[in-house]
A protein has these predicted regions:
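Conserved helicase ATPase core of P-loop NTP-dependent helicases/translocases
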Residues: 27, 40-52, 189, 199-200, ...
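Motif I (Walker A/P-loop) of helicase-class P-loop NTPases
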Residues: 2-10, 174
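Conserved nucleic-acid-binding Ia/Ib motif block in the N-terminal RecA-like helicase ATPase lobe
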Residues: 14-65
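Conserved interdomain linker/interface between the two RecA-like ATPase lobes of SF2 helicase motors
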Residues: 129-188
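Conserved helix/coil segment N-terminal to the catalytic DExD/H
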Residues: 46-76, 87-92, 242
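Conserved RecA-like P-loop NTPase helicase motor core
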Residues: 64, 214-310
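Post-DEXD/H (motif II) to motif III coupling segment of the RecA-like Helicase ATP-binding lobe
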Residues: 75-76, 83-141, 307
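Conserved strand-helix element at the start of the C-terminal RecA-like helicase core
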Residues: 15-26, 163-172, 177-203, 307
Length: 319
């Protein structure tokens, strides 16, 4: 989507503002602009306020405080991860910017809270999706586990997830699955919203793994991701909040869902991390661990419905 957006911006021929919400995304755009267009972009954020270049990449946090200064400077505005537009910080920028062309980019047009209904108000009704030949259709492996997800509604949801995440047997299952797919030649991404689970699984996996959570600064994250790209490491344990969007590591080809997901847009975003084309890349695989219990079964059926809707092949194995 980065490449496509730059091609559109170049064709429109307008001074362009690209709005992002993380340093990782900003760096990604900087690199792609230089690689694709051969120019240096301007930066708004991290103490910089560079508005002279024909393309400027801005962090939303900084831009929201200075939008009145640049509201009439740009003919095109591109909002990356545009599903955030329902947040006032993002929508305020779009509302105040007088750009003729407003483009939103996202891996999904759905939000679990239903706020995707406002997307048309900001970006119109034209929707363009990449052709299937631009990515590799993954297969899904469902792993039947004997670990039980608590069903009692009297127990807070967070504690129910923790009961699974901190279960030593479950941790070993996750680490084992990651190692198995790495042994098959995959670069494996294991995602969870429980940092302790990720750290423990990384320890169990050993020297072939790294763990990226919000505790690491951007420089350290980049160094660890580079180890995956170069083949120094094969397994990446990453927090859901970081790898749910805005991360491009084309070498990744296997996704292990380490904690239950009941959010179709998030699931689609996570799968998007492993399906990008790369020469020599084998067919991506989504490893979905099915737990015991009524709640877990209901969520598992919902995920399976997503896979079927997307046309993914599904196979079931016992752990």
């Amino acid at each position: 989507k980065t490449f496509t957006a730059l091609a559109i911006a170049a064709k429109l021929g307008q001074k362009t503002l690209i709005v992002v919400h993380t340093l990782a995304l900003r760096k990604q755009w900087e690199e792609e602009i230089e690689k694709c267009l051969g120019i240096q972009c301007g930066i708004i954020g991290s103490g910089k306020f560079e508005t002279d270049p024909v393309i400027v990449v801005a962090n939303v946090q900084t831009l929201s405080k200075k939008i009145t200064q640049i509201s009439k400077m740009f003919g095109t505005i591109i909002l990356d991860e545009m599903h955030h537009v329902s947040a006032p910080t993002f929508s305020g920028i779009i509302d105040k910017c007088s750009a003729r062309y407003k483009i939103g980019l996202s891996g999904t047009l759905q939000r679990k809270d239903g706020k995707h209904i406002i997307f048309n108000d900001y970006f119109g009704f034209d929707v363009h999706q990449p052709k299937k030949e631009n990515y590799i259709v993954p297969r899904v492996t469902i792993v039947k586990s004997e670990v039980r997800f608590p069903d009692s509604s009297k127990i807070p949801w967070a504690k129910r997830v923790n009961a699974v995440a901190y279960d030593e047997g479950y941790q070993r299952i996750v680490a084992q699955l990651a190692s198995v797919y790495a042994a098959k030649g995959h670069k494996v991404l294991v995602v969870s919203d429980r940092v302790q689970l990720l750290k423990r699984c990384a320890e169990l996996t050993g020297d072939n793994a790294t763990c990226i959570t919000g505790e690491l600064d951007q420089t350290t994250r980049d160094k660890e991701i580079e180890k995956i790209r170069t083949g120094e490491l094969d397994i990446l344990y990453g927090s859901q909040s970081i790898f749910g969007e805005g991360i491009s590591v084309n070498e990744l080809s296997a996704l292990v869902l380490a904690t239950p997901i009941n959010n179709e847009p998030l699931l689609i975003q996570l799968i998007g991390r492993i399906i990008r084309k790369l020469e020599g890349k084998q067919q991506p695989v989504v490893v979905d661990i099915h737990l015991k219990g009524n709640t877990a079964s209901r969520q598992a059926r919902a995920r399976s419905a997503v896979y079927i809707k997307q046309g993914y092949d599904i196979q079931v194995v016992a752990n």
